């Protein structure tokens, strides 16, 4: 399949290279999730209303019994962390959603007639209300929309808490309706994305289409440079051949990748 920059045919790519990029992005997202977990895995018990308690509490023991990695040492900060903790977790989750949303956009685009790189089963498409030739990629469109919704949550949380002074305020109650659905929403998003990717069909031999021949222009430039032609001259020669319709592909897709 062709690779794109600026939505223009750039260089040869492959299904493995394309999907592998998203796999690697998700591994980076996992690092953010781990960091968010570590920042959240602190014991706030004993902070009471935000200024500690005179009760003889063993905070180290409760930290160990409840499985926290450590404790919040400052009672005021334990309360100030409300909203901050939720925003940190939501940001990590939104990073996963952003990756999934970009993949969904690719799939919507690559499924369209103008690209035609992937084919979706009928169970993942719907017909048009009046155009019988259309099969719309509804599943990936909804994945994209739900991913964008999750991406907006960190800002929603920030706007609830951003100008609060020190201490607890009832404003924080609004976090619950924003934050709690996040976990099920992302899990559902990952489940349906997994199903969709597993059931889509990647078309083969895409690069044999003459439309994508210019994608091999870089290899042709490199070949001429290796024969002693200055890069600038080789670049201009190949560009002129493409402009005048005389460019011929010599490199194979295997050699290029």
Language model features with spans:
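Aromatic side chains
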Residues: 4-6, 22, 51, 117, ...
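Catalytic-core signal marking the mid-to-C-terminal active-site face
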Residues: 125-257
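Residue-identity detector for glutamine
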Residues: 8, 39, 64, 79, ...
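Short, flexible active-site-proximal loops enriched in glycine and acidic residues
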Residues: 1-6, 73
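Internal glycine-rich alpha/beta core junctions
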Residues: 11-160
């Amino acid at each position: 399949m062709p690779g794109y920059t600026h939505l223009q045919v750039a260089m040869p790519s492959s299904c493995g290279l394309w999907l592998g990029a998203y796999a690697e992005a998700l591994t980076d997202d996992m690092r953010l999730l781990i960091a968010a977990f570590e920042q959240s895995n602190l014991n706030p018990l004993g902070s009471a209303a935000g200024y500690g308690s005179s009760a003889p509490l063993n905070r180290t023991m409760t930290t160990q019994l409840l499985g926290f990695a450590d404790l919040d040492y400052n009672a005021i900060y334990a309360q100030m962390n409300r909203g901050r903790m939720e925003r940190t977790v939501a940001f990590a989750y939104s990073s996963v959603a952003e990756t999934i949303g970009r993949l969904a956009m690719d799939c919507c685009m690559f499924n369209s007639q103008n690209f035609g790189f992937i084919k979706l089963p009928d169970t993942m498409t719907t017909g048009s209300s009046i155009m019988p030739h259309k099969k719309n990629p509804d599943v990936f469109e909804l994945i994209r929309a739900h991913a964008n919704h999750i991406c907006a949550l960190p800002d929603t949380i920030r706007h609830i808490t951003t100008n609060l002074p020190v201490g607890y305020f009832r404003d924080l109650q609004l976090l619950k309706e924003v934050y709690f659905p996040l976990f099920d929403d992302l899990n559902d998003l990952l489940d349906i994305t997994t199903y969709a990717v597993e059931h889509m069909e990647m078309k083969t031999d895409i690069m044999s289409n003459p439309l994508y021949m210019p994608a091999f222009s870089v290899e042709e430039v490199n070949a001429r440079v290796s024969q002693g032609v200055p890069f600038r001259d080789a670049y201009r020669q190949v560009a002129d051949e493409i402009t005048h319709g005389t460019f011929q592909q010599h490199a194979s897709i295997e050699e290029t990748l």
